[in-house]
C-alpha cells in the first residue's frame, strides 16, 4: 500500500473527523506509514473502506471492541446500514478486519508527552477508569451541523461512553446545551412517565472544543416505530419535569416572548454581516448555503415575532420544558420504559406542545421529504388531533403552532450564525410560511 500524509489536511470526512478527534498539534498521524522520528505509537485504526471513501475508524488489536463498535445498537439503525454493519461486525469478531488490506491510521506522540494530556481517547479511558479502552468513530461527509462522536469500549466490548465533540460555534453551543439538560434531568428520568435519559458522565474543554461524555444507552434498547402515536404522558412529564402542571399564562409578558424578541433583534443586527460570518466557517458545507440566505432576514424575523404577539398575546397556555428534538429516531424502548436521547436542543419556558409540534414537523420534513409549508400544515393537523390531550384549547393550539414555527426559524438562524450555514429546507422557506400565516 502507498503511504499517505497526515489526513488532517484533507477536506473530506476523514480530514474533518481527524481534526476534531486528534486536534493536538503534538499528535502524529500517518496512513500506512511509519510514525515521525522520536514518536511512540499509541493506537492504530482501520480506515474502512478506504481513505477516499472512509466511513469508519475502527480500533485495531481488540477484536471484541471493534465488533462492538459496529454491532452495538444496530437494531436502532435503518435496515441497509444495519446489514452493512452486521457484516463488518462479523468479520471484526473473527479478526478478519485487522488482517484485511484496509488502510491503517497510526496515532503517535513524542516519547515525553503524556497520552492522557494530548489524546482525547486516552483521556477518556482515564476519566472512565477502564484501561485499556478503545475508541471508534463513524465518518460522514463534513457538515457544520454535525458533531463527530467517539464511541469508547472496554476490551471485552462493553460500551463505556460516547463523547460528542462540539468543534465550531454552532456545535459547541449544542454540546453545552445538552450538558446543561442532562445535568438537570436525573431526578426526573424514569419518574412519573418521564422517559429514561442517559446520564452525563463529564463535560470537557479539549483542544478548543467542547466535549460531552454521555452514558451508553442500554444494549437492549429498541427503536420506536416511525408511525408511533404521540406518547402524551411522556410529553407532559418532559414539559413538567415529572412535577405538577403549571398555571397557564398569556403569551404577552412571558419570558418566552421576551427571548424570541431578543433573538430576532440579534438576527436583525446581524443582517449585514451574516454572509461574511457563514462564509468564514472554513468548512465545505453539505446541505447548507454559504450565502446569507436572503436580504434582511433578521428584520423579517422581528416583524414575525411582533405579529405573533399581536395575534396571540392574550392567549394563555402552560409553559414548561421541551426535549427540543422529539422524533422517532431519538426515542427507544427498554424494559417497558421510553428512552430519550440527544437533548442538545432542550430548553425551559416554552409553550407546552412544542415537542408534539416538532414531531409532526420533522416527520413531514425528514421522513416524507415535504417542503416547509407542508410540514407546517402537518403541525396544525397533529395539534388538532392530539393537542386537547395536552390541555390545549383551539386558541392554544394555534399559538403553539405559530410560535413553534418562529422558534424553528430562530434555531435555524442561531446555527447559521454559529458557522453552520443556512439549512435550505428551512430558509428562507420557513420565514415565508410564517409571514403567510400571520397575514391570513
Label for each model-derived stretch:
Residues 181-192, 218-263, 302-316, 324:
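Conserved kinase catalytic-core helix
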Residues 127-155:
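ATP-binding glycine-rich phosphate-binding loop
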Residues 354-391, 405-418:
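Active-site activation/catalytic loop segments of kinase-like enzymes and analogous catalytic loops
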Residues 209-219:
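Conserved short submotifs of the Hanks-type protein kinase catalytic core
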Residues 147-152, 310-354:
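Active-site acidic catalytic loop and adjacent metal/ATP-binding pocket
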Residues 150-177:
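ATP-binding glycine-rich loop module of kinase domains
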Residues 70-138:
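Juxta-kinase regulatory segment immediately upstream of eukaryotic protein kinase catalytic domains
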Residues 199-208:
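Short beta-strand micro-motifs within the conserved protein kinase catalytic domain, predominantly
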